[in-house]
C-alpha cells in the first residue's frame, strides 16, 4: 500500500469507504489503515465561508480610500 493511499484514506471519507468495501482492489488491508481525521462539520464550514464572509468581508461593497488604505466605508466609491 502506498503512502498516498494511506494519506487519502485518512482525510477522504468517501475514499476510505470505498477502500474498506474492497481493500484488495487497492492492494491494502483494512487493519493497516491509520485512524481517520474527524469529518468536517458542514454547518461550521458554512458559517466560516458563507455567513462570516457575507456579513464581514462583503459588508462594505464600496469604499472611500486614500492611497493604499481604505479608511471610510460609506457605500460610495470615490
Swiss-Prot record:
The modification (3R)-3-hydroxyaspartate is found at residue 74. GO terms for molecular function: signaling receptor binding. It comes from the Bacteria. Maturation of lantibiotics involves the enzymatic conversion of Thr, and Ser into dehydrated AA and the formation of thioether bonds with cysteine or the formation of dialkylamine bonds with lysine. This is followed by membrane translocation and cleavage of the modified precursor. One of its GO terms (biological process) is defense response to bacterium. There is a cross-link at residues 60-77, 64-70 (Beta-methyllanthionine (Cys-Thr)). InterPro entries: Cinnamycin_RiPP, Dur/DurB-like. It holds the Pfam family DurB-like. The keyword Cell inner membrane does not apply. There is a cross-link at residues 65-78 (Lysinoalanine (Ser-Lys)). Keywords: Antibiotic, Antimicrobial, Bacteriocin, Hydroxylation, Lantibiotic, Thioether bond. Residues 1-59 form a propeptide. There is a cross-link at residues 63-73 (Lanthionine (Ser-Cys)). Can act as inhibitor of the enzyme phospholipase A2, and of the angiotensin-converting enzyme. Shows inhibitory activities against herpes simplex virus and immunopotentiating activities. Its antimicrobial activities are not very pronounced. Belongs to the type B lantibiotic family. This is Lantibiotic cinnamycin. The lineage of its organism: Bacteria, Bacillati, Actinomycetota, Actinomycetes, Kitasatosporales.
Amino acid at each position: 500500500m502506498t503512502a498516498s493511499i494511506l494519506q487519502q484514506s485518512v482525510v477522504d471519507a468517501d475514499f476510505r469507504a470505498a477502500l474498506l468495501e474492497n481493500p484488495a482492489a487497492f492492494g491494502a488491508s483494512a487493519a493497516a489503515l491509520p485512524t481517520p481525521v474527524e469529518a468536517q462539520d458542514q454547518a461550521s464550514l458554512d458559517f466560516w465561508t458563507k455567513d462570516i464572509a457575507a456579513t464581514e468581508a462583503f459588508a462594505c461593497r464600496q469604499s472611500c480610500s486614500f492611497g493604499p488604505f481604505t479608511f471610510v466605508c460609506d457605500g460610495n466609491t470615490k
